[in-house]
UniProtKB/Swiss-Prot annotation:
Belongs to the aldo/keto reductase family. Substrate binds at H138. It comes from Oryza sativa subsp. japonica (Rice). One of its GO terms (cellular component) is cytoplasm. This is Probable aldo-keto reductase 3.
Amino acid sequence: MAAAAATAPAAAVVRRMKLGSQGMEVSAQGLGCMGMSAVYGERKPEADMVALVRHAVAAGVTFLDTSDVYGPHTNEVLVGKAVAAAAATEEEVQVQVATKFGITPAWEVRGDPAYVRAACEGSLRRLGVGCIDLYYQHRIDSTVPVEITMGELKKLVEEGKIKYIGLSEASASTIRRAHVVHPITAVQIEWSLWSRDVEEDIVPTCRELGIGIVAYSPLGRGFFSSGAKLVDELPDDDFRKSLPRFQPENLEKNAAIFEKVNAMAARKGCTSSQLALAWVHHQGSDVCPIPGTTKIHNFDQNVGALSVKLTPDEMSELESYASADVVQGDRYHGTFLNTWKNSETPPLSSWRSGN
């Protein structure tokens, strides 16, 4: 049965939520903007993407996620233009832009103070803003004590160049060390029905420290929208074609997960993507998923996930479909950038001024 066979719920009112405990407020669902400019095939037409962002903001999704490495750089420029266009028509709407640093255009990871500052200045310029709402360390530099990186970020807060600090793909111990230097507002992690290893240590740590959780790839990089046939529709330069879970030997087995999710979605009168996204929303009021899309129709479907209600039994049933022993393939291939599993940094005592 095709994922679109079910009737999607009407668009929900997008509530506001507190992200973390430092005062940041965002829409309860964000918009991941990466695919508009990078990674998932060719860059999309700018006018279409500006229209999509304006549509999102008008619908109440005002939390936009980008990074300096998307493009590289072009996604921040796009988001900056879109926010300016939205502000011109939605005068009373406050948009929160989150961007990231730490992955160079050469796909190296850096967290040294000079790089942090230069990256921030570049993002401010490309976004066309005087202050970044939420600034994440995109990947953790395992050669630089996280306290050193955080020290520079703290200075940028004090200078009014960033408002809140976040981490992405950071281990629990790295989160704790960083939080001592300056409060962390949010940690961005991959969290979806088939990526749940963060629940063991990272999620509890965030909740203990009052840190908000931003879930990226909540639809399994599109898998829960259309299942195995997704790969057949991807262009050759789409990043997902290199991921272990999308390799033929794994995809054939993972297809059964989608079919079960899709069958439950049909019973509930929603789409498979709405069901998978609703599962993330039901993880707690401190969790903000940021599904990405390049199509207004898909955006509207994603907002509809806010109307899907799940019972504890339905949550458990969904989780059984995609348990760790069922999902085949890792999130990334072994040569990819640091993930939280290898994000430990040297002790602060090892750092000498001038490194």
